[in-house]
Amino acid sequence: MASSPQVHPYKKHLMQSQHINFDNRGLQFQNSSLKVGQDFSDNKENRENRDNEDFSTADLPKRSANQPLINEHLRAASVPLLSNDIGNSQEEDFVPVPPPQLHLNNSNNTSLSSLGSTPTNSPSPGALRQTNSSTSLTKEQIKKRTRSVDLSHMYLLNGSSDTQLTATNESVADLSHQMISRYLGGKNNTSLVPRLKTIEMYRQNVKKSKDPEVLFQYAQYMLQTALTIESSNALVQDSDKEGNVSQSDLKLQFLKEAQSYLKKLSIKGYSDAQYLLADGYSSGAFGKIENKEAFVLFQAAAKHGHIESAYRASHCLEEGLGTTRDSRKSVNFLKFAASRNHPSAMYKLGLYSFYGRMGLPTDVNTKLNGVKWLSRAAARANELTAAAPYELAKIYHEGFLDVVIPDEKYAMELYIQAASLGHVPSATLLAQIYETGNDTVGQDTSLSVHYYTQAALKGDSVAMLGLCAWYLLGAEPAFEKDENEAFQWALRAANAGLPKAQFTLGYFYEHGKGCDRNMEYAWKWYEKAAGNEDKRAINKLRSRDGGLASIGKKQHKKNKSISTLNLFSTVDSQTSNVGSNSRVSSKSETFFTGNPKRDREPQGLQINMNSNTNRNGIKTGSDTSIRKSSSSAKGMSREVAEQSMAAKQEVSLSNMGSSNMIRKDFPAVKTESKKPTSLKNKKDKQGKKKKDCVIM
């Protein structure tokens, strides 16, 4: 017979454990069992070979030409039968165990050629001899597999004879429950009945073992099972106890059992159990979050060399979870984990070293070490540390002193690596680069749309708006212009809170792009964008509410007040050119004839100035003008009042200039001002001080 493809090892193990024979017509099962002490016609040499056979890699036995088609089952104490028909079995040779009720569909027969041929020296079913309390595995095989519990009952055989292995201890997802539900229905509560029997058999075998690895795997399995059970009041029939039990009570029972085993192992210093128990405390898997207990266990496991626990302890010290913040200790745990190639620890240590965080120095050597740690993290980057190549790409894109030379080509490679690992900012940045092109890569519409789509599907609002722009303009040959699709992406980005997208959506509603024209919705989105400080939306609302007109009035009023200040200086400059106070007064009176309210203040200002000059000969009337200006500013607005105070200063300066002009035109007054210098009269001294103050 020609050789056929190799049989899957799990399938071989299942077939050997169940003593299934095949012929060319297909797979047939018979529900009968052999006696343990049955004598087979095999020679001694073959019997010795069979005793040392590793059944995980064994081949299926050949059926001789005269051998009848008989399928025999030999089960261990922990291996259930695949059928319920045990009428012809001899129960006195083994302990019966109630199996799960599985209805297998064997209508699709599989030929022997599809399962593979077997050599002539393969072991016969008689080599599988068992006792009532042991399985067919030897002690050496147990050490190889690192399991002392036979979990072959977790293998299921579907209608196509394909063997599926459930990862009972390796994976969080409980695949066995999914497989059983396939036959019994996902919404059928009785699907837990065979599962509970399986768990009970697993529990009884674990109680006989003192191996910490076995106990830990059982606790892990119970924890995973409890987390996959839905918390509901649906009743499940328990075969071991009278009555029914709800799924919520069953979940609590499994959680307590898992927690009990993990606590016992943690006390003995088993680091894996310490980490799993701490993770359950920190995540609230056991009912509530207990960060303090979690930190103690993380720290204890880290001291035993558990790398993940060291990283988690560093995080607790950094964030103050269950303990006080301590940057120095956090960095020490981080260095321990990073030195053992923990990707997240290498990434964080590189980031902190380059940017000088967590109390690390900011010298060049520390920054260079940060670049090295980021490079190591990028080389081992995964989906959880996809930001490592992104941060390293930013450094190589900009460069750093003479240590890191800018390399845009290498930066692009790092951006692509980060985007391939699912890093959203890298995908958005690549889309923007390919949209316009740069010195390293040219414009590529297809790649731009690809990266925009990748980031948009993960919720990036900037990428959504980028796709909106492409659909609004068209991105051939990828796709043609589609305003409806552009509107949908703008709507998603606006709902995500992007101000530009909110303004864009308002524009679409206003002009009917991809939707019906609706001004009410348009102004609604304009208001949202303005609330998020979008300048275009703010200007849009001002134009609607007449804000521009009110701003124009305020600006016009401000200009008039400024021109009023210029008028004061104009009047004073004219008085200095003419050289007489009377001409200044007449000039100001003729200039303000148009507005009586405005004429009052300058006229009173000049009249008081003239009267004071004639009376004292020295004082220019600046104090009176200031009082007049301050009294007139009471009815003005706050803005005009501030401008009037500036006007007062210019008026006083212009009056000081006019006082010099007065002293030149009237020499008699000038000579009289010098006489008090030789007198000892207090009044004359006060007049001299006033005169000096005005001149200064």
Curated annotation (Swiss-Prot):
Farnesylation is required for chitin synthase CHS3 activity but is not required for SKT5 membrane association. It is a lipid-anchor. Disruption phenotype: Decreases CHS3 chitin synthase activity. Decreases cellular chitin level. Resistance to Calcofluor White (cell wall stressor). Normal CHS3 RNA level. Decreases conjugation frequency. SUPFAM superfamilies: HCP-like. SMART domains: SEL1 (SM00671). Belongs to the SKT5 family. Activator of the chitin synthase CHS3 which polymerizes chitin, a structural polymer of the fungal cell wall. Present with 2580 molecules/cell in log phase SD medium. This is Chitin synthase regulator SKT5. It comes from Saccharomyces cerevisiae (strain ATCC 204508 / S288c). The gene is SKT5.
